[in-house]
């Protein structure tokens, strides 16, 4: 399948297309000397520039003082677990009827059903990829719905969990772009998120063993707002990886002019053979990031292979109780 770029023919896109035609298969170490994954950012950490220092001063508790007791109960999870820069940017969404209705639905689900991912992981994407660090957006659809898999990042599974078929195909595609890439034994993609890849599903929760069971409940409206914020806040542009028809539809109506959109079929075994392995999205992502931001901002796809993933006791506990 031919990869479609954003319809706005930007100069940077032209540069990438030219590079794509004349560059040989690069090595990952051409982009990096050393790259190690960092832990999830916490709200108390000092952010690394003036803009983010102002964001870090946002006081969730002061904001929450104006909530009614009922609203506070519904929104306690967001207050406790959503990273501050994202919370500040999205706070107007929380009091909209659709979001309060979504939270009422989830309250009932948690009382009577097994729901994935665990509550504390629903917004893990916001800590691994704070708003100011976002440079790539990877669009997912639905969290994994089997025990021990989902932890808040699309396509990623917990350490020790076998790689799902779609992720296996993602690794194969990276190997085509970068022949020296070592196929990881883990599907734990936190090192990618820590480098600035916002790994965002359309729906952030799912009922156990029932795919798409929380679709149409309000998450899609919220995650669309997340995308809107990310795209509007980054004037130099982001890379957007949209795999499959649902991902492409999520981009409709969004401000894409400044951004580099890469579309392809989904990496699922049902569709990957129709062009995913030939899309070269991983190489193109780095070529564009290097052109826009410099080589130090490229993604080290091998960081997943290089990580020494350890299953924390909390992860073991949550996996065993899901």
UniProtKB/Swiss-Prot annotation:
Catalytic activity: Hydrolyzes single-stranded DNA or mismatched double-stranded DNA and polynucleotides, releasing free uracil
SMART domains linked: UDG, UreE_C
Cell compartments where the protein resides: Mitochondrion; Nucleus
Single GO MF annotation: uracil DNA N-glycosylase activity
Active-site residues per Swiss-Prot or TrEMBL entry: 142
Gene3D superfamilies hit by this protein: Uracil-DNA glycosylase-like domain
Gene Ontology CC, one term: mitochondrion
NCBIfam families: PRK05254.1-1, PRK05254.1-2, PRK05254.1-5, ung
Family named by the database record: Belongs to the uracil-DNA glycosylase (UDG) superfamily. UNG family.
Name the record gives this protein: Uracil-DNA glycosylase
Organism, scientific name: Schizosaccharomyces pombe (strain 972 / ATCC 24843) (Fission yeast)
Lineage of origin: Eukaryota, Fungi, Dikarya, Ascomycota, Taphrinomycotina
